[in-house]
UniProtKB/Swiss-Prot annotation:
Keywords: Metal-binding, Pyrimidine biosynthesis, Zinc
Cofactor(s) in the UniProt record: Zn(2+)
Cofactor binding description: Binds 1 zinc ion per subunit.
One Pfam family of this chain: PyrI_C
Function: Involved in allosteric regulation of aspartate carbamoyltransferase.
Organism, as annotated: Methanosphaerula palustris (strain ATCC BAA-1556 / DSM 19958 / E1-9c)
Gene: pyrI
Gene Ontology terms, MF aspect: metal ion binding
Family of the protein in this entry: Belongs to the PyrI family.
Gene Ontology annotations of biological process type: 'de novo' pyrimidine nucleobase biosynthetic process; pyrimidine nucleotide biosynthetic process
Name the UniProt record assigns to this protein: Aspartate carbamoyltransferase regulatory chain
Length: 155
């Protein structure tokens, strides 16, 4: 059987109120959940679609979070691994607000520096701080540059 002539439909049910994170690079949806602290033990109702066909992106992920609107700090975290994503606020099954994410200039307390000698990885009470650059994330304290696999460094 071919898929010619089939109508496009919803892959996951709509939510009444909450947040839909769309246009996440295919395969990154679970990392988005991780950086939001939404794990298997949370009580929030979640829907995740992975590697959905997208005309714009080829493949994308979608995350739906019922009865929760994201804070700016959470959106900034998402921007680190999904800079092309859009955040849709849903109220009574309708899109109330839709916007893209903005990559912040600096992010604190979100990324763990991979340099074992960095002051943020010692027993000192220092919060990690990274400057976002075109080439990657640069540690404010030791100048270490993270250029790939940013999701694995998220605290």
């Amino acid at each position: 059987m071919t898929d010619e002539g089939l109508t496009e439909g919803l892959l996951i049910s709509p939510i009444r109120n909450g947040t839909v994170i769309d246009h996440i690079k295919g395969g990154e949806g679970l990392n988005v959940l991780r950086i939001l602290g939404l794990t298997g033990t949370c009580t929030v109702s979640l829907s995740v679609a992975t590697n959905v066909t997208s005309r714009q992106m080829g493949r994308k992920d979608i995350v739906k979070i019922e009865n929760r609107e994201l804070l700016k700090e959470e959106v900034d975290r998402i921007a680190l691994i999904a800079p092309q994503s859009s955040i849709n606020i849903i109220r009574e099954f309708r899109v109330f607000d839709k916007k893209g994410v903005d990559i912040p200039n600096q992010i604190c307390g979100v990324i763990r520096c991979p340099n074992p000698g960095c002051i943020t990885n010692t027993n000192e009470p220092v919060t990690s701080r990274f400057t976002i650059q075109q080439s990657g994330l640069r540690c404010h304290y030791c100048d270490w540059l993270i250029t790939k696999d940013i999701a694995s460094h998220i605290i």
